[in-house]
């Protein structure tokens, strides 16, 4: 008898169960694990039920939501949560990014809204970056039953920690030196991993050179067989992938159609690189070695049999791959015959190019006594042979002409691109490893100064580059932008050359200290007078150590000695570096040894510690001044004891390395944390308690630190690969690697984080990996309104305190575009009264009121956006205007200033309080508190609270 679970299976489920056994072994190694997440809509449904229950509005919820939650086997209506959100008439409040500036401004807004009776009407409290600071303070106060946002002790704690990163300023302050020591410790560990890895790569050419010059003549036949075997495997893999990925499903009937499924199942270009390009590069390196040794042996020319073998190899692999994939090849005999002819011609071209390489090698071999001949062969041989395959691809496309489909041409074109990448990478590696130290001889007297100056210059350039033209409004061809683009390249090149030079000096020190005789010239080797001088770099005027012929000769002799007689030393160094790299990569957590924990601990001490300090419960360590009980799990806020709004902490999911063409400008998406669930549209969501370490799930401190991780190598649309390299190497890293909701939460941290560190280094974080890179929410949307639009809030109060001295309002503009594209929602708002400023830089209004068109055909579903902008209209209190008179940039002082004194703190707080009161405080006596309603909003829209310089009200 079948079990109940078996009887309820759908036909699709039965089909999946039948094939699951066959795919089990394949999935383990090649296929992604089945998604463990749920859609965002299901997470929102849980939030709405909690809001309805807390506010007493649960009877208004759409019954379809209740039914769906009661019967898990019934699929809920896809729009049921939207109907529920509309009926609940949700109120959302948002705090924008902007560091401590935004936090203090939004504190004033909070206090004003509470005084007006509006705060208790808020259902969602959404924050980004600096707005998250004060969001966490408010949540901690509500959790600890602090009755008012005006609580003197809680607010006083914030004032005393206005310099939250280093409360005690000064050169000899322990706080200041702690910043330096934490950064230095973490950077040294991180750099040890990266430098050892780079050194490993730079040692590889020396092993290749040893194989190139010590190839036993007795094994030449075996080497030729191995070479053609590797090339045959590589070509066959390319063609199998080509046919399988471009043939129709009904055509894939050959014997390899099923057995090569793992080959196709790899995501992206993984199959091509693992099974085709890596063997091809290895085969070409071996081929170059054979050509060099044949040239050294004195053979006049390559045997003619190689021409036949090259053509036969190409034809055989083509035919075998074609037949193995498409069983109906008999009906395509004409096309197959034409392809065979093309394959033969391509094989002949490859032989001709190989013969050209052989002739060049013969010339170099005559003067290799010792000299750069063998090293030139290593530098040019394999890259040129790999590039020759690209030329064969070009010839093949041209000969097939109209007979080749566009899809096939595109496939071959992309293959040629990868061949170019691999060819250039191998060439650059050999050039840096071998020729880099040689060129440093000419720079010997000022290389140290250049390195120090270059490091300082590129560090400054990295900070400049963080101010992207997308938001700064500056000319992208300005000097700063050009410097930011060039300096990271210069530093990266300098770093690689310095590591290469260090390796060279370390390996050749023994040669120069001992009387090692120079290698004797080989019999029949010509030694023209200028053979060594031809390899030297150009003379640099003004240097005290000119590169002489004798210096170049010594260099090549030492290099040849270390790569031949002392190859064991090279091997032991390689092993030692590998051990160091592996151990550190295993033990050094890429999250815990970034600057994020330092940042998080100080945010927690300032903003979350305030509530416990107000209650007299905070007991900090007398030495460090930290109390790690200040922080608590975000998931705790869904418990019955908490009666505040549902917090949404917004971060940016970096998708720089993703393949979605629609995200090429954004290069990030929204990733949110709430007490109920966390995730994104791309990854789905999981219960928040399953994120982070420990039973309580991810903490609020970690969430707000991630939401405020502005300085990160991957920064959404701000990301630049060269700046990412610079910031990662110098450990300017505040972002967080967290497990994707797609995968089970059995492990939150990557045991081997080195792979993800490389993604950070090259700026290629994506959304398909097990671990995702989250950074500042402002790298996607800086107002925090995006997720409230997704939840269809009826009333949204948006506080914008981002740095915007020119009133560009890029945050609002980006929000409008994203909502129109992603949700098909239009936001209609006129901000001209805020933008228009007089000679004193005073705006005509502090805020603007707009409509949110959730449904263009149903105006009853419209929402309303109240946009509060940090601005001055001239009606502010005297202390605010006095601070403005002394600080012209107020209220848009740089976000880099995270050290607020009392005057600065109080000025921003009072400004936020003033703007919120002027926007919402009604003129009619006896009508307070304000109740958000359509009637009240329409009253404003019809001029009931028109803007005026005296009142500083809303523009409508």
Per-region residue spans from a language model:
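Catalytic domains of lipid- and phosphate-ester/thioester hydrolases
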Residues: 2-956
